[in-house]
From Swiss-Prot:
The gene is ilys-2. InterPro entries: Invert_lysozyme, Lysozyme-like_dom_sf. Belongs to the glycosyl hydrolase 22 family. Type-I lysozyme subfamily. This is Invertebrate-type lysozyme 2. One of its GO terms (molecular function) is lysozyme activity. Keywords: Antibiotic, Antimicrobial, Bacteriolytic enzyme, Disulfide bond, Glycosidase, Hydrolase, Signal. The active site is at residues 28, 39. Has bacteriolytic activity against Gram-positive bacteria. May play a role in resistance to Gram-positive bacterium S.aureus infection. Its EC number is 3.2.1.17. Residues 19-138 form the I-type lysozyme domain. It comes from Caenorhabditis elegans. The lineage of its organism: Eukaryota, Metazoa, Ecdysozoa, Nematoda, Chromadorea. GO terms for biological process: defense response to Gram-positive bacterium; killing of cells of another organism. Expressed in pharyngeal muscle cell pm3, nerve ring and intestine.
Amino acid sequence: MFVKAILLLSIAVAYASADCLHCICMRESGCKPIGCHMDVGSLSCGYYQIKIPYYEDCGQPGKKHGESTEVAWKRCADDLKCATNCVENYYNRYKHECAGTGQGACEVMARNHNGGPRGCHASGTLGYWKGVHSCCGCS
């Protein structure tokens, strides 16, 4: 019975995470591969409007041997699977910065995605979070 409860909880968490990611994607690009655009003085690219330092922080998923970081970043950002992997990696790298805030996983993911490693502490990310929350109802 305990194993069954853990399995059901894991499935529920996976769905909540997928809903949260989808809503972040919708907020950033309508969940479309929109290429790169200037945003606050630097390029943001793809489904999640990822900037190059964010791509570096998420571990540069999908980067091929001998490929420049810039080429890999732009390609990854316009590939939904790769870009989603980057956002998940970024969340996992920086979620500890938000321990003790009482924020749920989706709020931490959304606010850090929008505001950087300590975005969960920045009041400027609240509007972004409210938009994501209204999409999925996630916490």
